[in-house]
Design a protein with these regions (language model features):
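The C-terminal output helix
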Residues: 113-126, 166
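N-terminal/domain-start alpha-helical segments
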Residues: 1-119
Length: 227
């Protein structure tokens, strides 16, 4: 999941970003409204965590712009005001959720995850390939009934490939969807992560390399399972 945090209190913004990254999300940060606007014009985010009181361009203005962009980006507003009229006003601007500072961090993570599920097409409870299962909600991977311990990045890569339904995903797209803007596109990050992921998943191999194009889980192996 790709998330943008727009917050002018730098310590808070950085703390939120670190926490979301620890939960496996790819997170970018902007410290004012104009920077947030610039980032959203370049990158498609699943969720924007948006402070209302921002310099350069207010959170309200940025929220309005996001709502008219036609994207499926979801917005959760942060504010120090717990007045009912302020919450109503924020939601009327088009925000999907509203959280008052100070907040419990586990609650923020839960709300961001819930909004992220709404920002993407509905997925089945499980993504599978051969004898492998990935539960997107619980962030658990099993093969032949046994749990496979993956890092957050490995799990993110696997989830993107399984959800693609056999389509080829380039290294650049994986870097954009699983990492954040600080990832160096010229490094071997994706290749190294892929090697580790394949080793942990074991044999028979599930992930194919398409030379010059990227990676895929063949559609014959990958399927979506419903209840």
């Amino acid at each position: 999941m790709r998330v943008l945090v727009v917050e002018d209190e730098k310590p808070l913004a950085d703390a939120v970003a670190r926490g979301l990254r620890r939960d496996g999300m790819a997170v970018d940060v902007a410290y004012d409204g104009e920077s947030g606007q610039e980032k959203t014009s370049i990158t498609r985010y699943d969720v924007v965590v948006l402070d209302r009181d921002l310099p350069a361009m207010s959170g309200d203005e940025l929220c309005r712009e996001l709502m008219t962009s036609g994207e499926l980006t979801r917005v959760i507003m942060l504010t120090a005001s717990d007045a009912v009229e302020d919450r109503v006003e924020g939601l009327s601007l088009g925000a999907d959720d509203y959280l008052v500072k100070p907040f419990a961090f586990p609650e923020l993570i839960a709300r961001v995850r819930a909004l992220g599920r709404r920002a993407t097409p509905a997925q089945p409870p499980l993504l599978t390939a051969q004898d492998l299962e990935l539960d997107p909600a619980k962030r658990i991977v099993r093969r032949s009934g046994g749990e496979v311990e993956l890092t957050r990045k490995e799990l993110g890569v696997l989830e993107v490939l399984l959800a693609a339904g056999g389509a080829v995903i380039s290294s650049e797209e994986l870097l954009e969807r699983v990492w954040d803007e600080n990832a160096d596109p010229f490094t071997t990050t994706v290749r190294v992560t892929m090697m580790s992921l394949r080793k942990k998943l074991g044999e028979p191999g599930i992930i194919e390399t398409v030379v010059g194009a990227g990676y895929r889980v063949p559609s014959a192996a990958a399927e979506r399972v419903r209840d």
